UniProtKB/Swiss-Prot annotation:
<dbReference type="InterPro" id="IPR033729">
    <property type="entry name" value="SerRS_core"/>
</dbReference>
<dbReference type="InterPro" id="IPR042103">
    <property type="entry name" value="SerRS_1_N_sf"/>
</dbReference>
<dbReference type="InterPro" id="IPR015866">
    <property type="entry name" value="Ser-tRNA-synth_1_N"/>
</dbReference>
<keyword id="KW-0547">Nucleotide-binding</keyword>
<dbReference type="InterPro" id="IPR002314">
    <property type="entry name" value="aa-tRNA-synt_IIb"/>
</dbReference>
<comment type="pathway">
    <text>Aminoacyl-tRNA biosynthesis; selenocysteinyl-tRNA(Sec) biosynthesis; L-seryl-tRNA(Sec) from L-serine and tRNA(Sec): step 1/1.</text>
</comment>
<protein>
    <recommendedName>
        <fullName>Serine--tRNA ligase</fullName>
        <ecNumber>6.1.1.11</ecNumber>
    </recommendedName>
</protein>
<keyword id="KW-0030">Aminoacyl-tRNA synthetase</keyword>
<feature type="binding site">
    <location>
        <position position="379"/>
    </location>
    <ligand>
        <name>L-serine</name>
    </ligand>
</feature>
<dbReference type="GO" id="GO:0005524">
    <property type="term" value="F:ATP binding"/>
</dbReference>
<keyword id="KW-0648">Protein biosynthesis</keyword>
<dbReference type="GO" id="GO:0004828">
    <property type="term" value="F:serine-tRNA ligase activity"/>
</dbReference>
<keyword id="KW-0067">ATP-binding</keyword>
<feature type="binding site">
    <location>
        <begin position="344"/>
        <end position="347"/>
    </location>
    <ligand>
        <name>ATP</name>
    </ligand>
</feature>
<dbReference type="InterPro" id="IPR045864">
    <property type="entry name" value="aa-tRNA-synth_II/BPL/LPL"/>
</dbReference>
<dbReference type="InterPro" id="IPR002317">
    <property type="entry name" value="Ser-tRNA-ligase_type_1"/>
</dbReference>
<dbReference type="GO" id="GO:0016260">
    <property type="term" value="P:selenocysteine biosynthetic process"/>
</dbReference>
Length: 411
């Protein structure tokens, strides 16, 4: 959640940045009106309170005590009424603020959508073939690794069953990713896949993205769309010791998304599924640590791809493509020869204090004052998409898949 004081004191500047992130101008106009009303009603409340303080002190020496008592009693009622007005405005402001995204960093390019993201660099050269490479779903069906028909039968569309060496390769990737991330200093944690509404709110999924979440009927429980949600909220409502920061964690989980806005996109294969697996990086830092930890996380995910021999590129997301909670995001896109293009396989984001304010995660700074932490998250990596990348990049003309050397010990 945004700092409402900063929003009020620097409204025009912040509003301009939020417009770049596609915040509705009517919402910004409503906020401006609420801030003006709140200022007016607070001023009136302060005047009533000042009257009460001044004349309460004079009551003992007043000549007409009964008259003054009556005035003070009447003024107290006005204070109660005015306090209710102020509280109602503050609650309305906070409710609107819950649905307003984070402010983009200064380094984030202004743009409308993914077409205006900025390529930062390419890592490794794409694979070359002396034959036309197949897409992963063709390979998966011919090798009996991917069973889409039975996945749909037991669930619905956008579900798949992994079988035989495909399932083994997926398991090997999970173990390798966890080991790789741990070697970079990230502590492995295992968390529930079902979390409560407060946890969903803390990282920004609720209330804005409620329609894309799977909820358990009659219970305050949601299936997670990423392990960023439970891992970040492990420290919700806590005040951390300065010397414990940064906290760097990695976690494997299944992820569940309705993909409400993805009709017609990636309908074949396992690129976009309602259930998929991911190994995540999550960090909690002091404000002055978050930029360097962001670079560590990005390097970890990129080096992991390189260790698998997968060509990829770094993209800085523009304001129009930036996620709700993120102040800055760099995507990693892996080369898929079957599709003849790069596809997203990781997003690394710095959320600054946006999630920490919602989840109430603080630390005691060097001056002994409680200060909001910064939170960061990133995929290292999306398991299914890494499986896709290996299948397409390591195929031969007979349709067989060769296993990267670093994974062989996991079979």
């Amino acid at each position: 959640m945004l700092d409402l004081k900063n929003l009020q004191n620097n409204f025009d500047e912040v509003a301009k940045k939020l417009k770049n992130k596609k915040v509705d101008e009517n919402i910004l106009k409503k906020l401006a009106e609420l801030f003006a009303s709140l200022k007016k009603e607070k001023t009136a409340l302060e005047e009533f309170q000042a009257f009460q303080n001044k004349f309460s002190k004079e009551l003992a020496t007043a000549e007409d005590k009964e008259s003054l008592k009556a005035k003070l009693s009447e003024n107290k009622s006005k204070i109660n009424e005015q306090s209710a007005k102020v509280n109602a405005l503050e609650n309305e402001l906070e409710e609107i603020a819950h649905a307003i995204p984070n402010i983009p960093d200064e380094c984030v390019p202004v743009g409308e959508d993914e077409d205006e993201n900025v390529e930062l660099k390419k890592v490794l050269n794409p694979s070359s073939f002396d034959f036309t490479p197949k897409e992963h779903f063709e390979l998966g069906e011919s090798l009996n690794w991917l069973d889409f028909v039975r996945g749909v039968k037991i669930s619905q569309s956008r579900f798949c069953v992994l079988k035989n060496e495909g399932a083994l390769l997926s398991r090997a990737l999970v173990n390798y990713m966890i080991d790789f991330n741990r070697s970079r200093g990230f502590e492995f944690v295992n968390v529930p896949f079902l979390v409560n509404g407060a946890t969903m709110f803390g990282t920004g999924q609720l209330p804005k993205f409620k329609e894309d979440m799977y909820k358990v009927d009659d219970e305050d429980l949601y299936l997670i769309s990423t392990s960023e949600i439970p891992v970040t909220n492990l420290y919700s409502g806590e005040i951390l010791a300065s010397e414990t920061l940064p906290i760097k964690m990695t976690c494997y989980s299944a992820c569940f998304r309705k993909e409400a806005g993805s009709a017609g996109r990636d309908t074949r294969g396992i690129i976009r599924q309602h259930q998929f697996e991911k190994v995540e990086l999550v960090s909690i830092t002091k404000p002055e640590q978050s930029d360097s930890v962001f670079n560590e996380m990005l390097e970890c995910a990129s080096d992991l791809l390189s260790s698998l021999g997968l060509a990829h590129r770094h993209l800085m997301l523009c304001t129009g493509d930036l996620g709700f909670s993120a102040a800055k995001t760099v995507d990693l896109e892996v080369w898929l020869p079957g599709q003849n293009k790069y596809r997203e396989i990781s997003s690394v984001s710095n959320c600054r204090d946006f999630q920490a304010r919602r989840a109430k995660i603080r630390y005691k700074n060097e001056q002994g004052k409680n200060e909001l932490v910064h939170t960061l998250n990133g995929s290292s990596l999306a398991v299914g998409r890494t499986l896709v990348a290996i299948m397409e990049n390591y195929q031969d003309k007979e349709g067989k898949i060769h296993i990267p050397d670093v994974l062989k010990k996991y079979f």
